[in-house]
């Protein structure tokens, strides 16, 4: 068979796949006679309401000299780790705004960070394609820096996201620009499983984000520049359990819903979407029209403890609080006093749900508390 014939067969197969996907999309739309907000309205549900003092900025964490790219809370709610383009990880006391650790990184181009479940270690990764682990209790070296306690090497592209397996300091999942996700054994520094890559059901572009289910830690979801999200079982690396379609741009962020049966996605197309992992169906789209201007990209997201609220960061500095049930914006933190002056790059909710932390390219982190005292 000639090269020309192979190319023709490949093009025909690609077109067939595209046609089948479109037919599947149309069939799903026929079966979905309503969405979450439509059903909620039919049941007489009313939107969540916010007063001017219900969610206020009570702390401003200043110390980074470069864009803040990532943050994470400890399970005990009073500490935050942040990663910045200044090449440092900073661990903050969220109650006092004091820095407890400042770790200078070998590679300044850090993109992600995470606290271990015990709060004793932090992980980070970036353009060096390595996920580095730092033990916060280890003695500092003669230059005043914390030494790396473990380097997880194996990715062939940048490390875009990392998350510890819930209740385990010994296992962690990373996503990468090499189109794969990896489950690591931190004790040995070895890869336990690789998800994607040479496998047909893997992503076909950079993987940007991962989220592990807290109710079933064997399951995690990944979001990619191929516009899809995929559900994985960490015991079955050879294939994704489901692939979720709907976005028209890179999927920048994914986050499990508190009950573990659904998850949210945020994309370059300016929308967030809610999917059900049991049916594979899209339940809701969260989108706020912005006129004829450029559509701001979704950069980060987090659900409230109950799941009724969805906090979403955008590239234009907005931070919307969505009512997930009625798909309504109930508050925009980008339009209140003490809002950020740049892109919202990351955000996260404390373990008890009492506070939200946002990080921005303006180099600051801000803690927003429900019913707190404004700074």
UniProtKB/Swiss-Prot annotation:
Quaternary state and interactors: G proteins are composed of 3 units, alpha, beta and gamma.
Molecular function terms from GO: signaling receptor complex adaptor activity
GO terms classed as biological process: G protein-coupled receptor signaling pathway
Name of the featured protein: Guanine nucleotide-binding protein subunit beta
Gene Ontology cellular component list: cytoplasm; heterotrimeric G-protein complex
Hydrolase as UniProt keyword: no
Family: Belongs to the WD repeat G protein beta family.
Keywords attached to this entry: Repeat, Transducer, WD repeat
Known function: Guanine nucleotide-binding proteins (G proteins) are involved as a modulator or transducer in various transmembrane signaling systems. The beta and gamma chains are required for the GTPase activity, for replacement of GDP by GTP, and for G protein-effector interaction.
WD repeats: from-to residues: 63-93, 105-135, 154-185, 202-233, 246-276, 293-323, 339-369
InterPro entries documented for this protein: G-protein_beta_WD-40_rep, Gprotein_B, Guanine_nucleotide-bd_bsu, WD40/YVTN_repeat-like_dom_sf, WD40_repeat_CS, WD40_repeat_dom_sf, WD40_rpt
């Amino acid at each position: 068979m000639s090269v020309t014939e192979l190319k023709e067969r490949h093009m025909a197969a690609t077109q067939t796949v595209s046609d089948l996907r479109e037919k599947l999309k149309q069939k799903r739309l026929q079966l979905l006679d309503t969405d979450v907000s439509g059903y909620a309205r039919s049941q007489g549900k009313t939107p969540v309401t916010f007063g001017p003092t219900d969610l206020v900025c009570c702390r401003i964490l200043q110390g980074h000299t470069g864009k803040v790219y990532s943050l994470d809370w400890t399970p005990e709610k009073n500490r935050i780790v942040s990663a910045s383009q200044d090449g440092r990880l900073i661990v903050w006391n969220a109650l006092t705004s004091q820095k407890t650790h400042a770790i200078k990184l070998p590679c300044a181009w850090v993109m992600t960070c995470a606290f271990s479940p015990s709060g004793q270690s932090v992980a980070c990764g970036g353009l060096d394609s390595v996920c580095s682990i730092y033990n916060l209790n280890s003695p500092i070296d003669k230059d005043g820096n914390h030494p790396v306690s473990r380097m997880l090497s194996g990715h062939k592209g940048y490390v875009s996201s990392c998350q510890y397996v819930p209740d385990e300091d010994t296992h962690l999942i990373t996503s990468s620009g090499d189109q794969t996700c990896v489950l690591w054994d931190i004790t040995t520094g070895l890869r336990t499983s690789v998800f994607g890559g040479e496998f047909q059901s893997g992503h076909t572009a950079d993987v940007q984000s991962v989220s592990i289910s807290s109710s079933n830690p064997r399951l995690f979801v990944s979001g990619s520049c191929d516009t899809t999200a995929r559900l994985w079982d960490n015991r079955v690396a050879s294939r994704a359990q489901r692939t979720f379609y709907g976005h028209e741009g890179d999927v920048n962020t994914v986050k499990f819903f508190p009950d573990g049966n659904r998850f949210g996605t945020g994309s370059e197309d300016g929308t967030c979407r809610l999917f059900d992992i049991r049916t594979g169906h899209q339940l809701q789209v969260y989108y706020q029209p912005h006129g004829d201007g450029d559509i701001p990209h979704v950069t980060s997201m987090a659900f409230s403890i109950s799941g009724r609220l969805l906090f979403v960061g955008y590239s234009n500095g907005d931070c919307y609080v969505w009512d997930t049930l009625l798909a309504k914006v109930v508050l925009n933190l980008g339009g209140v006093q003490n809002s950020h002056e740049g892109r919202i790059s990351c955000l996260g909710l404390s373990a008890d749900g009492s506070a939200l932390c946002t990080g921005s390219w303006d180099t600051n982190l801000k803690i927003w508390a429900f019913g707190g005292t404004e700074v």
